[in-house]
Swiss-Prot record:
Cited InterPro entries: Cyanase, Cyanate_lyase_C, Cyanate_lyase_C_sf, Lambda_DNA-bd_dom_sf
Name by which UniProt lists this protein: Cyanate hydratase
Catalytic activity, as annotated: cyanate + hydrogencarbonate + 3 H(+) = NH4(+) + 2 CO2
Name of encoding gene: CYN
GO function terms (MF aspect): cyanate hydratase activity; DNA binding
């Protein structure tokens, strides 16, 4: 399975490279975020049937036989060696360093809960800092999910026998 995914990803990356387009250009042409386009081309996200024609228009050399493959639920995995890449390592370091404070602010602003990584949008943007140097802006836009008190009376599997829904 991983081997097949690696082959498909290599093909998708070649199509993107040969197009000469950036993820930002593809995002603009498809109406998706730049990170989501990258996720699609790495088989980390599922291509929506309504989006397929937009992606095909943005990447005319995308082989037709890859489109149905991109519409299948992907195996969302990653190479464990990826952490050795300096950018990925620094992202992990930033989340670990600021994570506890971010969690505390989420709890303070919203209550006991978390940010969804399923109902989630992500983008990477470039801006100039006050010193005139380039800066990276990462936006994580996730739905707030409150934790719930686990009352037995609300546990459907206990109130209705399994198979008799």
């Amino acid at each position: 399975m991983e081997r097949k995914k690696a082959k498909i990803v290599a093909e998708l990356q070649a199509v993107k490279h040969n197009s000469g387009k950036s993820y930002n250009q593809l995002a603009e042409e498809t109406g998706l975020t730049n990170v989501y386009v990258a996720q699609l081309l790495r088989r980390q996200a599922q291509l929506n049937p309504q989006t397929a024609p937009l992606l095909r228009a943005a990447l005319p050399d995308l082989p037709q036989d890859l489109v149905p493959e991109m519409m299948r639920p992907p195996l969302r995995s990653y190479d464990p060696n990826l952490i050795q890449d300096p950018t990925v390592y620094r992202l992990n370091e930033a989340v670990m360093h600021f994570g506890e404070s971010i969690k505390e602010i989420i709890n303070e602003e919203f209550g006991d809960g978390t940010m969804s990584a399923i109902d989630f949008y992500c983008s990477v943007d470039k801006i100039k800092g006050v010193d005139g140097k380039d800066r990276v802006v990462l936006t994580f836009d996730g739905k707030y999910l409150p934790h719930s008190e686990q009352k037995s009376e609300h546990m459907v599997s206990r109130t209705r026998p399994l198979g008799k829904q």
